[in-house]
Regions:
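Transmembrane beta-strands of outer-membrane beta-barrel pores
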Residues: 9-15, 64-69, 121-125, 168-174, ...
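Residue-level signature of outer-membrane beta-barrel architecture
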Residues: 1, 51-53, 64, 109-111, ...
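Outer-membrane beta-barrel "beta-signal"
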Residues: 289-301
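Repeated loop/turn-to-beta-strand initiation elements of outer-membrane beta-barrel proteins
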Residues: 3, 56-60, 114-119, 157-164, ...
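Membrane-embedded beta-strand positions in outer-membrane beta-barrel channels/transporters
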Residues: 46-48, 104, 147-149, 186-188, ...
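Surface-exposed coil loops of outer-membrane beta-barrel proteins
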Residues: 18-48, 55-149, 244
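Detector for outer-membrane/organellar transmembrane beta-barrel domains
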Residues: 153-245, 259
């Protein structure tokens, strides 16, 4: 049983008129492309205490959190190493996600050798560039994001690779932020095959209001590790129905396709070219489809 302080400070800035995070909406697409690649400047991502219990089979975190670290997680969700489109990440774009550095508490553990449970409560509305305001807001505003997740895995050490789960979430209404309350559900089934080389997945979500991007979403795809796990190919497709409470009624359904290949050039440096094909961008009736080309570099020292 061990404890640790976890923290992360970042500086995020654009080099052009539009940051990658805004590429989608800039072209009328309801969705986010590389959400971390924004223009927020210096900001706090997390600052919390992590306590592991029961020989590492249970964990509690408390402080300023990034809830995507433990809500609706699967192995290809990270925007740093996996898919770039948010439709293939937490909640399949059909979930309200608090901003980073939100004050709260989360915990999870193995109920049996195969069944796990994860829950959290956090401040729903926060600004990571003014992170310490979230502590007062948690106690004064009473506007919360809550989640509970029940899942099945082949073992505690396989929880990120072999994972079937159902996540339920709720967000409170905020008069100050001008956002509606709501609730929803997300599910995931992913399985690592062929000595962990191949991982197919199916994921989806439903939102009843809550200010999410999509109201209904379904994603399928796979990751394939090559050269003994050094490199990785990712292929995925998504169908999404924009949230009419967020964007209005009568919008077209969107279809998203993405392919990436991550080259691990050295132990520290990875380069990932990426192609996305966006069909029927809901907020741009003049365009039937859009192409997005990306190149991501990651240096881990």
């Amino acid at each position: 049983n061990t404890g640790a302080a976890v923290w992360k400070i970042e500086h995020r800035h654009r080099y052009t008129d539009q940051s990658p995070q805004g590429f989608g909406f800039d072209q009328g697409y309801v969705g986010l492309i590389e959400p971390p690649f924004s223009n927020e400047g210096t900001r706090l991502t997390n600052l919390y205490w992590r306590q592991r219990l029961n020989d590492g089979k249970a964990t509690i975190v408390a402080g300023m959190l990034d809830v995507t670290d433990f809500v609706d997680v699967y192995a290809l969700a990270s925007p740093w190493t996996g898919f770039m489109n948010f439709a293939f990440s937490t909640g399949s774009a059909a979930m309200f996600i608090p901003n980073d550095a939100t004050f709260g508490i989360g915990g999870g553990g193995m109920l049996t050798d195969r069944i796990f449970l994860i829950g959290s409560i956090a401040n729903a509305y926060t600004d990571p560039t003014e992170p310490f305001d979230t502590v007062d807001d948690f106690f004064d505003e009473n506007e919360y994001f809550t989640s509970i997740e029940l899942g099945l895995t082949r073992g505690h050490d396989r929880i990120y690779l072999d994972n079937a789960h159902l996540t339920l979430w709720h967000v409170d209404k905020s008069n100050r932020a001008g956002t509606p309350g709501g609730w929803g559900a997300a599910f995931n089934y992913s399985r690592a095959l062929r000595d962990n080389a191949l991982m197919p997945f199916i994921r989806g979500g439903y939102a009843n209001d809550g200010g999410s991007l999509l109201e209904k979403s379904l994603s399928i795809g796979f990751g394939y590790n090559t050269f003994g796990g050094r490199d990785q190919l990712g292929v995925a497709a998504n169908w999404g129905e924009p949230n009419e409470d967020s964007f209005g009624s009568g919008l077209d359904d969107q279809y998203t396709f993405e392919v990436f290949y991550r080259f691990q050039l050295t132990e520290q440096l990875a380069i990932t070219p990426d192609i996305q094909y966006l069909v029927d961008p809901a907020l741009n009736p003049d365009e039937d489809n859009l192409w997005v080309f990306g190149l991501r570099a990651r240096l881990a020292l």
